[in-house]
């Protein structure tokens, strides 16, 4: 589903670019242009509720809608489910008081993770290419969670506002472009509009970084993970920076600068904790295999990579073979994929990754009814499991059972109402089952979550005209139309 960027927040990335282009005209002109273009509210001084937890929550959700409209996100329920579970595991051991977390996974090969006020945590899938273990990945996530728990954004803006007036439009624009085009570009947008190139509003200060390092490591340890993973991951990041030209330094390192001293401090801090054995996590290695497939130029390239790993040395032979199964499936080579899967599946028949891989092979072989039966049995063991549910709906749809797939996804949407991919798939199966009113409603939810409020309003209006003598449905549609109006008003009265 395509849509134009019409809502105010969905244009933030364009405005950030505008800020860069007009910087030579003077920072005050840039700030004025951004504010007028966005029609963002005057938030008052730093003593107002703009820094309350609830304000940050609303700001973060508005930002997320904008962000989704401008980046390519990963549509992989297995990977998302894994990262979401890991994030919540860390959050449960953190100092974060408001635990309403929203995760976004960006399809980008670079090293990057970011946290946005209000509990939005973003991860580039490329980060898993660099993190060799789950603990190393968790190091980065725990660091970002620490920035949230210590409210470094609000504290930074408080300080910045005491030096010069803050323009929220420029801050949000910089946040969008910093998480997409790179840290320097985002900071340039912010700095130009604030006339404070020397005081980057969103670049974490050294004291904030040290605080996030310390608190993040404590979160890591409290979650039962390896503190030595932190210096190992930071060292790997620093090494990647040394062999990279200045303009290609990963985004995370632009906004979270590393040094030998900082790594040494992290290593010394890790030594203060008792040593323990931390075995590698197979599930993480399986997720890395999925990411390698996602980022490969072609399925055949992935096939060759995994065959090479199996012929040489691999951190996890089982994960490498699983990656080969996925690559062969993507290449349409079902028989070869099935043989490779059989060699690793026998010892763990209930592992969800393998159950779904088997179902995908069945679907590729044009046996969707068999896939649906297997997935239904597995769902009885783990009711509501998101990756299994999404694959089950896919198998049902391929088996000409769109009406049942609609029922399955409708129930799942009640559990995960903020999942854009789920609403997209639900709209597709509703179209196939002939539920046109439902199709428009689901498309509206998809557009709302992606920041396209005008498109969402159109879809709801289409649905409203089709409803005949159904008061409950009419009432639900009217309520969502009112919600869209409220979202627009919120932009002007935060």
Short names for language-model regions:
Residues 2-9, 16-114, 198, 242, ...:
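Hydrophobic or amphipathic, alpha-helical segments that drive membrane association/targeting
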Residues 32, 43-50, 61, 73, ...:
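Extracytoplasmic and endomembrane cell-envelope/extracellular-matrix remodeling and assembly machinery
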Residues 70-80, 93-103, 157-160, 185-188, ...:
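Surface-exposed patches in mature extracellular/periplasmic domains of secreted proteins
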Residues 123, 139-147, 151, 212:
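Active-site recognition of the HExxH zinc-binding catalytic motif
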Residues 125-139, 202, 207:
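Short pre-active-site segment immediately N-terminal to the catalytic Zn-binding motif
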Residues 135, 145-162, 180:
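Catalytic Zn2+-binding segment of zinc metalloproteases
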Residues 165-181, 188-200:
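Membrane-active amphipathic alpha-helices enriched in small hydrophobic residues
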């Amino acid at each position: 589903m395509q849509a134009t960027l019409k809502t105010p927040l969905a244009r933030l990335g364009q405005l950030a670019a505008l800020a860069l282009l007009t910087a030579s005209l003077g920072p005050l002109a840039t700030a004025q242009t951004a504010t007028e273009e966005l029609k963002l509210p005057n938030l008052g001084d730093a003593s107002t509720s703009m820094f309350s937890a609830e304000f940050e929550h609303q700001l973060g959700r508005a930002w997320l809608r904008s962000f989704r409209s401008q980046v390519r996100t990963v549509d992989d329920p297995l990977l998302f489910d894994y990262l979401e579970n890991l994030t919540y595991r860390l959050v449960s051991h953190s100092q974060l008081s408001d635990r309403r977390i929203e995760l976004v996974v960006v399809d980008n090969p670079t090293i990057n993770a970011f946290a946005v006020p209000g509990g939005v945590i973003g991860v580039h899938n490329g980060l898993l290419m660099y993190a060799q273990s789950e603990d190393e990945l968790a190091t980065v996530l725990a660091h970002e969670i620490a920035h949230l728990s210590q409210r470094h954004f609000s504290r930074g803006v408080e300080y910045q506002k005491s030096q010069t007036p803050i323009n929220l439009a420029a801050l949000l624009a910089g946040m969008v472009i910093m998480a997409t085009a790179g840290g320097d570009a985002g900071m340039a947008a912010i700095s130009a509009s604030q006339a404070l190139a020397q005081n980057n509003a969103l670049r974490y200060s050294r004291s904030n970084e040290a605080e996030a390092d310390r608190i993040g490591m404590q979160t890591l340890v409290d979650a039962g993970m390896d503190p030595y993973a932190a210096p190992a991951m930071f060292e790997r990041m620093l090494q990647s920076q040394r062999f990279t030209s200045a303009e290609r330094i990963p985004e995370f390192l632009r906004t979270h600068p590393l040094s030998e001293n900082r790594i040494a401090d992290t290593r010394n801090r890790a030594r203060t904790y008792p040593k323990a054995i931390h075995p590698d996590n197979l599930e993480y290695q399986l997720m890395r295999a999925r990411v390698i497939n996602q980022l490969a130029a072609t399925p055949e390239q992935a096939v060759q990579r995994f065959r090479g790993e199996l012929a040489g040395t691999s951190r996890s032979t089982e994960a490498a073979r699983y990656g080969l199964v996925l690559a062969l499936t993507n290449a349409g080579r079902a028989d070869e994929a099935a043989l490779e899967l059989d060699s690793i599946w026998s010892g763990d028949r209930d592992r969800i990754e393998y159950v779904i891989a088997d179902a995908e092979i069945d679907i590729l072989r044009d046996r969707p009814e068999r896939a649906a039966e297997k997935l239904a049995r597995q769902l009885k063991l783990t009711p509501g499991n998101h990756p299994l549910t999404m694959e089950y709906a896919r198998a049902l749809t391929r088996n000409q059972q769109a009406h049942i797939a609609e029922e399955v996804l409708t129930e799942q949407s009640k559990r995960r109402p903020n999942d854009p991919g789920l609403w997209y798939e639900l709209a597709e199966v509703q179209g196939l089952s002939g539920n046109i009113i439902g199709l428009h409603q689901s498309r509206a939810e998809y557009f709302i979550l992606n920041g396209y409020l005008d498109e969402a309003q159109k879809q709801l209006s289409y649905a409203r005209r089709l409803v005949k003598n159904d008061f409950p449905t009419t009432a639900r549609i009217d309520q969502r139309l009112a919600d869209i109006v409220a979202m627009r008003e919120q932009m002007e009265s935060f």
